[in-house]
């Protein structure tokens, strides 16, 4: 595939976006991780950019296939361009913002995102036989690299449900496969499976223990798998999906005001802090912002039942998400001040 065969409609750099190459190299060297926050709408995007601008943190705006369908690809492109301008308006002179496709499931989808101005794409062939995953990932890499778009591949399968992505069981990444996969595909980063999981119910109660207060305690992440991968691929950018911590105060608020989230449990933040100091340089967080948004909206609906102006409940939702994002940046991932 040559650049002359296909032409990209919009270049990510024209939108003011950056890819992940330099961002990840700095993160590995600096012992922190870059937040990758999923967004579907304006309030989420405002909250992400406000949090990143105020903390001067590099940030990855993630869009799933479902979010792309929901928000419309053309609007997303202009939202991303607007996000860069908005960040500058907030006083962030040199914003480091990536627009990334999360869980791309086909070459055609990845190509479309590259052509629409995305600066990074993920091709998830982890559900395919190994050789087919290699071939698909390589095809995406060959196309994307012509336009300086970085590519994330995946080895291993996460359990849980997120948009169209679902799996019953974990398949842990096999460290002995990673060198072969990266060398054959040319991918720029690798998502691995070490026990994180999609959704707000990351583990079944029978997989957990309970503490003295009767609260569920999730099984620990498989840091031995991560260490095995790092040993095989020293200094290579590693990605963790399904890394929401499912804040129990948000779950409690949702349930207090009519919700029905049972046994919602996430990844402990201390484990994510530990991962962020390793070669893990991108940590994906989606469910936590959904919980923060829903908690704020439910509280307004319950405490101010006469309210019907969307700004009166989406405003508090935006504020609650921003608070969450800043907490993740400053206290969990360690990325504050890394994009001055």
Residue ranges, per PLM feature:
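Single conserved hydrophobic/aromatic residue that forms the stacking wall/gate
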Residues: 1-11
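Extended, intrinsically disordered, low-complexity segments
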Residues: 296-340
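Shared catalytic-loop signature of beta/alpha-barrel
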Residues: 61, 68-72, 272, 281-299, ...
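Terminal accessory/targeting
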Residues: 30-39, 340
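Short acidic/histidine-rich active-site segments
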Residues: 242-245, 265, 285-289
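Short catalytic-loop micro-motif centered on adjacent basic/acidic residues
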Residues: 34-38, 99-100, 122, 238-240, ...
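Alpha/beta enzyme core
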Residues: 20-29, 42-67, 73-94, 103-237, ...
């Amino acid at each position: 595939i040559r650049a002359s065969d296909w032409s990209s409609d919009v270049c990510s750099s024209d939108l003011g976006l950056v890819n992940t190459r330099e961002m990840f190299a700095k993160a590995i060297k600096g012992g922190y991780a870059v937040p990758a926050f999923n967004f579907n709408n304006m309030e989420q995007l405002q909250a992400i950019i406000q949090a990143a601008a105020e903390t001067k943190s590099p940030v990855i705006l993630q869009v799933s296939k479902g979010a792309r369908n929901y928000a419309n690809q053309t609007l997303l492109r202009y939202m991303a361009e607007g996000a860069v301008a908005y960040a500058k308006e907030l006083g962030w002179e040199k914003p480091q913002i990536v627009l990334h496709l999360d869980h791309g499931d086909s070459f055609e989808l990845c190509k479309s995102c590259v052509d629409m101005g995305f600066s990074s794409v993920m091709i998830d062939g982890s559900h395919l036989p190994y050789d087919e995953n290699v071939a698909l990932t390589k095809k995406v890499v060959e196309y994307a690299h012509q336009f300086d778009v970085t590519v994330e591949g995946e080895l291993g399968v996460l359990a849980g449900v997120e948009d169209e992505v679902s799996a019953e069981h974990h398949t842990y990444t096999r460290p002995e496969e990673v060198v072969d996969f990266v060398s054959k595909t040319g991918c720029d980063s690798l998502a691995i499976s070490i026990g994180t999981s999609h959704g707000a119910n990351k583990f079944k109660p029978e997989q957990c223990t309970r503490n003295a207060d009767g609260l569920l305690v999730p099984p620990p992440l498989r840091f031995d798998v991560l260490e095995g991968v790092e040993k095989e691929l020293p200094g290579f950018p590693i990605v963790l999906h399904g890394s929401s911590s499912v804040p129990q105060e948000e779950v409690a608020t949702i349930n207090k005001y009519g919700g029905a989230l049972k046994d919602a449990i996430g990844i402990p933040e201390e484990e994510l802090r530990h991962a962020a100091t390793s070669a893990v340089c991108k940590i994906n967080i989606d469910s936590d912002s959904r919980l923060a948004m829903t908690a704020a909206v439910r509280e307004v609906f319950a405490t101010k039942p006469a309210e019907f102006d969307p700004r009166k409940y989406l405003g508090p939702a935006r504020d609650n998400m921003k608070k969450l994002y800043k907490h993740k940046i400053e206290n969990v991932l360690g990325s504050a001040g890394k994009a001055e």
